[in-house]
Curated annotation (Swiss-Prot):
Pfam families: dATP-dGTP_PPHyd, dGTP_diPhyd_N. Belongs to the Caudovirales dATP/dGTP diphosphohydrolase family. This is dATP/dGTP diphosphohydrolase. The keyword Lipid metabolism does not apply. Gene3D superfamilies: MazG-like. Its cofactor is Co(2+). It comes from Acinetobacter phage SH-Ab 15497.
Amino acid sequence: MSGNKFDQEKVDLHVLDPFFIEGTARVAQFGEQKYGRSNWMQGLTQTRIINAIKRHIAQIEKGEDIDEESGFHHAYHAAWGCQVLAYQHRNGQTHLDDRRWSESVRDADTKIGTCEGISGHTVPCMYEGPFGRLHPVDGEKDGLVMSFVQSEADEGTAQGDPIQQLQQMISEWADQVYPDRTVENALTKMMLHEIPELLHGKAMDPAEFADVAILLFDVAHLQGIDIAQAMREKMEINQARDWKIDPATGLMSHVKPKGMMETIRDAVQGIGDAARIMAAPSRLLNGNNMELAEYTAETLPKPPEKPWEITIPNWALKTEEGTHIKLRAGSGVFGRVKYQSQCILMHKNMRKRSHLETYYCATIKDTVTEDEYNVPWSEIEPWTN
């Protein structure tokens, strides 16, 4: 009876849960659909699998159990990744071992020996134990082999590129001194220790600059980033941009090209959401942005003191026909519609929004035909997001 008391509803550690096996099998099917082509073309490297396992474990730690993409528990995904790693090891697929370091049996006097991996790595071959090939022979020691992972194609470039040589030197030293470090460790030290030292009186000390650069280079290495190539590509982008000093912060920033929405907002600044024009004459939409901005600024009235009291008549609301937005037709000779003081600042979801978010009105002074108000969705969407 005492055994039942303590064992009730606890996990049986000596058996495999059939529901867990089924869940992992379903995740395997999901993985085949998502990664099957990549696996068939070149195989899944161990670093990629390990990173996927880490992501799922991290989500569990954050309190999320179910993966939004697959609908299965994150534990099933992690188990599937572990299965792939075990399969690659068991079948000697050393060409997929791209880990920065890997365990190896250094003693040459082994029962089975070691399998040579890529980039100087060695894959450990374990010995027969009481439950199969799980445990090393008593008295044998496992060691860590540190090596900088670099493809043969990059070796020639690294020999002549001082930045890549420097990154390699930093990573090899860091692997020996702090092999279990993470990206978060390096970034935290850089942000909380090294950079504040530069900001507080040590900006003239070359060693302090070097400390920041060393951490930055190591973070790039941990992420598998060739920092030299990344800087070259980024500089090409920076050289093509326009730069100016932000008067609010005093910092240099690149100038983002203004689109239609930004141009209108500048012209009607201080009038709330007046820039959200839902239906304007197509001749203006297809014209110059500044012409549209000036036209909008002229037609906008002053904001009322109580905007929530604005009443928008039903006949002024838009209608939707197919892929176009269309204002309700009025009356007039030859089908010409004259819109005077009608609300054209409408959101496509306006009827569902609260009265406090009522948009202001504008007046279209010109007399235009109904067809001129037919605007394709593709031209309206950027204005209403």
